[in-house]
A protein has these predicted regions:
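Bacterial Sec-dependent N-terminal signal peptides
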Residues: 1-23
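Catalytic loop of the DD-peptidase/beta-lactamase superfamily, centered on the K-T-G motif
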Residues: 20-55, 186, 192-195, 200, ...
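Active-site-proximal loop and beta-strand segments within enzyme catalytic domains
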Residues: 28, 39, 59-172, 188, ...
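Alpha-helical scaffold elements that line and support the substrate/ligand-binding pocket
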Residues: 43-52, 75-98, 102, 121, ...
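Short, solvent-exposed turn/loop segments enriched in Gly/Ser/Thr/Pro and often Arg
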Residues: 47, 109-110, 210-217
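Secretory-pathway/luminal and periplasmic proteins that interact with or process carbohydrate-rich
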Residues: 52, 111-117, 127-134, 191, ...
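Conserved residues at the C-terminal ends of beta-strands
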Residues: 124, 210, 442
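Non-catalytic beta-strand/loop surface segments
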Residues: 177, 215-220, 224
């Protein structure tokens, strides 16, 4: 269950999109991302009631060649936390608890409960240790039923990491206790109550908890690694081992229905939502990470659970929504494949604040014998004297700009090269005889010619 992290850099390349609609821009970005083999999963982007893009990319089940579509069912890991927080706020609205209540009111046997409030649990400011840190959790315990007794046995005598409310530290244990609290107050299993209060009200008919025993042709296979030549299936963790911190499975369409139900105040009031979307410590509210963006506040959560990664982002001011599911658990290990590499450009496109956005490029295998023809020194056709020195290194071009740091450039097509180190490209031009005479440097919307001088 991975938390939501700050924005990650992506392998990006400038591309002007003057005449396209927002939906077309989103689709083109995703088509290029998939072509570059940087994503396998499902994406949905919407604003208000309008779904602008909803599409599957790659394989739901690689071995059996079953492709993704918008019906694919994914585990969402820590994106479960907003659901748990919404139920807690629902109970507060109905007078069944107060966020100022001490944990000891409900669990008097927990010796630290007298210093910890429900609000501390919601905001990860309790100081309670991470339950999954116990020995053999990811090797053994996560794959079999994990009970409340198991949880308290480990937690009850472990000291707090810090004085409650003095610091922030993300801990799934907080949301386990919130789940147990929901059960104690309602007299119903957590899963049943979430279904009644959220799934049913929002119309989320393809969502649930027990993914291991789910019988559906739309059930997605999770992979620890999903690369060109390596596809390693994940073991399916028991939903009870993720519980109220990360146990939900769902579809992109159902997540959009959850988003709409919140916008329309069908589950909790606008007042409760405003409280939930407040930054209490370190950019975290009640089950939501909070970000400031040029056109207003963003709320969301990131989730990861064996075989699956999820990113759920919502724009408070424009009712936008971006849902990204991947069944490649390793995607967050690389900034090029991290789900933020989709989320950030999508936000830019939805806002319309940029006339450009960025598309990943795909390198072809260069012919080593052809690369030396591009080497040489190229000079800007001006009095500035800016130079580019091009050499060959490790079967790609290396360019040094004005005697600075070297940049590796990879061939996309004949005479056109790109770098992964910046938003720059080189396009070599030839004369009538086929001899290379100059190079065009593409950088920050500019196209700057450089003549070959040696």
């Amino acid at each position: 269950m991975k938390p939501f992290y700050p924005l990650a850099p992506a392998l990006l390349l400038t591309h002007v999109l003057c005449a396209q609609t927002t939906a077309e821009k989103l689709a083109e970005y995703m088509d290029a991302t998939y072509k570059a083999k940087l994503f396998n999963g499902v994406v949905l982007a919407a604003r208000n009631d309008s779904i602008l893009l909803a599409k599957g990319y790659g394989w739901r089940d690689y071995e059996n060649r079953i492709p993704h579509d918008t019906n694919s069912i994914f585990r969402i890991g820590s994106v479960t936390k907003p659901f748990t927080a919404v139920v807690i706020l629902y109970l507060q609205e109905h007078g069944q608890l107060k966020l100022t209540d001490k944990v000891s009111k409900y669990f008097p046997e927990y010796k630290y409960g007298g210093n910890i409030t429900i609000k501390n649990l919601l905001t990860h400011t309790s100081g309670i240790i991470e339950y999954s840190n116990q020995d053999n959790f990811f090797e053994e315990l996560a794959y079999k039923p994990y009970t409340q007794k198991d949880f308290w046995k480990y937690i009850k005598n472990e000291p707090l990491d810090f004085e409650p409310n003095s610091e922030y530290s993300y801990s799934n244990s907080n949301y386990f206790i919130l789940g147990y609290l929901i059960e104690k107050i309602t007299g119903k299993p957590y899963e049943q109550y979430v279904r009644e209060i959220i799934f049913n009200k929002a119309g989320m008919t393809h969502s649930g908890f027990d993914f291991k025993n789910l019988q559906s042709s739309y059930k997605t296979v999770g992979y620890d690694v999903f690369h060109d030549s390596v596809h390693i299936r994940s073991r399916i963790a028991d939903s009870s081992a993720a519980y109220a911190a990360g146990g939900i499975y769902t579809t992109a369409g159902d997540m959009f229905r959850f988003h709409k139900a919140l916008i329309e105040n069908r589950i909790i009031s606008q007042k409760s939502q405003q409280e939930a979307y407040t930054n209490y410590k370190e950019g975290y509210g009640y089950g939501w990470y909070i970000r400031e963006w040029p056109k207003g506040k963003l709320i969301g959560h990131k989730g990861g659970i064996m075989g699956f990664c999820t990113l759920f982002t919502r724009g408070v001011s424009d009712n936008s929504c971006i849902i990204t599911f991947s069944n490649d658990y390793s995607c967050s290990d690389n900034p090029e494949t991290d789900l933020n590499a989709i989320d950030v450009p999508f936000l830019q496109i939805l806002e319309g604040t940029y006339t450009i956005y960025y598309i990943p490029r795909v390198a072809i295998k260069s012919n080593p014998a052809s690369l030396p023809q591009y080497t040489g020194t190229y000079k800007m056709d001006s009095t500035i004297g800016f130079t580019i020195d091009v050499t060959v290194k490790d079967n790609h071009l290396q360019a040094i700009f004005n005697n600075g740091n070297p940049y590796a450039f990879y061939e996309e097509k004949k005479d056109f090269f790109f770098t992964k180190q910046s938003n720059s490209q080189l396009e070599f031009e030839r004369d009538a005889s086929g001899k290379i005479i100059d190079v065009l440097l593409y950088f920050n919307r500019r196209k700057v010619p450089h003549l070959k001088i040696k």
